[in-house]
Amino acid sequence: MNIKFPIAGLTAVIAAAGLAACGSDTSDSATAAPAASTQTAKPLAEIPSLTGRTTAVALDAGFVEALGTLKLTPGTVGDAELTKAGSLVFPITGGNVKYYKPGTVSPYVQGEIDHEGSGFSLTGGGKKVELTDFVIDPGKSVLTGNVSVDGEEAAKGAPLFFLDGRTLEPLKANDDGTAVLEGTTVKLKQEAADLLNQTFGTDALEAGLVIGVATITVNTA
């Protein structure tokens, strides 16, 4: 990983970008009143190129129960993994993050965390929906992705999940050169709920449904 700032600054930018650490249902995690453009403001810390490690989501029991009630079966797409413990794991394939002094620019955390070539599927009622190529926007507390239904593209870069960081735990730095952020709650967005309800002929899925709790692990060296 190309680190452009000292390790203290790196810790700050990881914490700020960690699945929208301060996100809530009613406010964006890294939004502040604009005081300067990014052309004049300089970031306090920056990760120009994210490489490797994962974003994992431990599926919530309520979500799993809802899938069972709707007779929907989850699966993986591409390089994703579904662990025996019930976590969906998506490799981080790229991205970049800049962290500005809050109040100087809006949003003060900018960039993206990419998960190209992986995703998960829901199958039921003769239909199969695949959600893939996730992109985390740490400034907006949103995860977007591509959606296909029975192999046909239904949406590209659609807002799928809200990332609520109010339950986020402190950053953990490990001896193996990684940093771990755990505790962000992943919730279904209205756009995704509407698409899934329409596809599977139900109205049971609602915005705000808790999908699970996320853990993001990135390389720091």
Report the location of each language-model feature.
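Bacterial lipoprotein signal-peptidase II cleavage site
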Residues: F5, G18-A32
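Extracytosolic secretory-pathway proteins
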Residues: Q39-Q110, T123, D133-A221
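Short aromatic-glycine motifs in intrinsically disordered, low-complexity regions
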Residues: D114-G125
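Bacterial N-terminal signal peptides that target proteins for export
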Residues: M1-G9
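Ser/Thr-rich, Proline-interspersed low-complexity disordered segments
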Residues: T31-T40
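Bacterial N-terminal signal peptides
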Residues: T11-G18
